[in-house]
Amino acid sequence: TDGGIHPRFGTRYFTLALKNGHYLEVVCPLEHPAADASPFGRVVSQRANEGGGWLTWVVSTEDLTPVENRLGRQAVDGSRKRPDGSELKWKQLGVLGTLDDSQLPFFIQWLSDDHPSTDGKAVAEIVKIEIAGDEKSIEEWLGSDLSRAFDGVEIQWVDPSTNDGQTGLVAVHLSTPNGVVRLD
């Protein structure tokens, strides 16, 4: 689904609605000064310049205040208009952490009732995520047990040395009506 343009970040979005409140988002940088000025725009541009691929993963929370207090940083407001004119609003935190350490997710708190997981009919669900990285580092960043953050989704840890030394999201497995599909 065409998710629209985020003028403040200099990026364009497409989303794939999934079951259980999940979604995948395809993001590309625009040729716009905001893509170089905002942390998220810089992260997206950097990944695009490296040839594309998985950027990161995101953990949604009902309240970012404890995360702000723990990390000693303030969340940044985000919003974007969809092609139908509706607007999504959220706060996000930790995008710069993704630049420094690609295994780390960033955090999001939705401020609008609407959500990308409702864009279209969801027929697939995330059943497994492969992450190259250090489980303890990610738990420390999250400030909680990983099983709570993943809510029933299996995590497969990949040794970065078997992933060309790269950390971060390696693959997402989707259960579809036609079987499991691995996106890498």
What are these regions (language model features)?
Residues 9-10, 53:
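Short, basic and Ser/Thr-rich N-terminal targeting/leader segments
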Residues 48-51, 126-135:
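Short, cationic low-complexity segments
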Residues 41, 45, 65-68, 139:
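Generic detector of well-ordered alpha-helical segments enriched in charged/polar residues
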Residues 8, 34, 113:
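Surface-exposed, flexible loop/turn segments at secondary-structure boundaries
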Residues 17-57:
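Active-site-adjacent scaffolding segments
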Residues 4, 12-17, 22-28, 56-58, ...:
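Vicinal oxygen chelate
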Residues 1, 135-151:
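Extended intrinsically disordered, low-complexity coil regions enriched in Ser, Thr, Gly, Ala
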Residues 1-7:
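Conserved catalytic-core motifs of GNAT/GCN5-like acyltransferases
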